[in-house]
Amino acid sequence: MDATVFTKCERCKQPVYEKDLRARFNVCPNCEFHYPLPAPERVRLLTDAGSFEERDGELAAGDPLGFEGYPDRLRSARKKTGLGDAILSGVGEIGGRRVALAVMDFRFIGGSMGSVVGERVARTVELARAEGLPLVTVSASGGARMFEGIYSLMQMAKTSVALSRFMEGSKPYISILTDPTFGGVTASFATAADIIIAEPGARVGFAGARVIEQTTKERLPEGFQTAEFQREHGMVDRIVHRLALKGDLERLLGFVG
């Protein structure tokens, strides 16, 4: 991409060089707005250089329900992102400490959790348990993948059972919530951690605010479902700027890893 290309920030509306945005891992240099970050870039941000080894990349989603248009959506998402599904998982080092890591990618069909995403999360958890590693996940998801129906919903149980076994050990599970994290991902592995971190301004919840208001016929509080609101009400432990995440993880792993 041409380094002279500008984009307008979604929040402050100021022009930003694309190269400056990329250099700051998609954080606006003017107002610190956190844009979504592709999974490969997230891995580069969090792990020590050259330490990440992908696992289970061969897994690929099928079309179990014969849902019209789903195979085309999968092909398009794979071409757009270069990923097999909405997740990148494996083993890497953070501050010299080996960890099991699973990172979601919202670009791939809204980061939705289907059978492959759930399986890779579960396998990452099981790997951490088998090898005695700390576990780190990064969520960015609209929820369950409707194209897979009950197969998608089953992933909530699968990941939760894997985590319950992992929690019998002594290694920590750190979950990072990014914008947006919703639906079945929120209701399963994303909020079942020892330590829950969120990026500033991240939207976190189960159903969207508009759906809740239409159902309850009530106006929601200002800032409802933001990371800041969730921290005030006990769902999030800490809010950490994206560019400080690696250092924060290094300190936390030094204490509890």
UniProtKB/Swiss-Prot annotation:
How does the cofactor attach, per the note?
Binds 1 zinc ion per subunit.
Per the record, the zinc finger regions (C4-type) lie at 9-31
List UniProt keywords, sorted A-Z. ATP-binding, Cytoplasm, Fatty acid biosynthesis, Fatty acid metabolism, Lipid biosynthesis, Lipid metabolism, Metal-binding, Nucleotide-binding, Transferase, Zinc, Zinc-finger
Q: Which GO terms describe its biological process?
A: fatty acid biosynthetic process; malonyl-CoA biosynthetic process
Q: Could you tell me what reaction this enzyme catalyses?
A: N(6)-carboxybiotinyl-L-lysyl-[protein] + acetyl-CoA = N(6)-biotinyl-L-lysyl-[protein] + malonyl-CoA
Q: List where this protein forms a coiled coil.
A: none
| Binding residues annotated for Zn(2+), in chain numbering | 9, 12, 28, 31
Is Metal-binding there in the keyword field? Answer: yes
Which cofactors does this protein require?
Answer: Zn(2+)
What subcellular locations does the record give? Cytoplasm
Top-level EC class as recorded in UniProt: transferase
Q: Which residues form the CoA carboxyltransferase N-terminal domain?
A: 5-257
Q: Which GO terms describe its cellular component?
A: acetyl-CoA carboxylase complex
Pathway per the UniProt entry:
Lipid metabolism; malonyl-CoA biosynthesis; malonyl-CoA from acetyl-CoA: step 1/1
Cross-referenced InterPro entries, in alphabetical order?
AcCoA_carboxyl_beta, Acetyl_CoA_COase_Trfase_b_su, ClpP/crotonase-like_dom_sf, COA_CT_N, Znf-ACC
A single Gene Ontology MF term assigned here is: carboxyl- or carbamoyltransferase activity
Q: What Enzyme Commission number does this protein have? A: 2.1.3.15
What SUPFAM superfamilies does the database record attribute to this sequence?
ClpP/crotonase
Question: Which NCBIfam families does the record cross-reference, listed alphabetically?
Answer: accD
- HAMAP family attached to this UniProt entry: AcetylCoA_CT_beta
Family, according to the entry, reads as follows:
Belongs to the AccD/PCCB family.
UniProt function note:
Component of the acetyl coenzyme A carboxylase (ACC) complex. Biotin carboxylase (BC) catalyzes the carboxylation of biotin on its carrier protein (BCCP) and then the CO(2) group is transferred by the transcarboxylase to acetyl-CoA to form malonyl-CoA.
Q: What is this protein called?
A: Acetyl-coenzyme A carboxylase carboxyl transferase subunit beta
Question: Which organism is this protein's natural source?
Answer: Rubrobacter xylanophilus (strain DSM 9941 / JCM 11954 / NBRC 16129 / PRD-1)
Q: Which gene encodes it?
A: accD
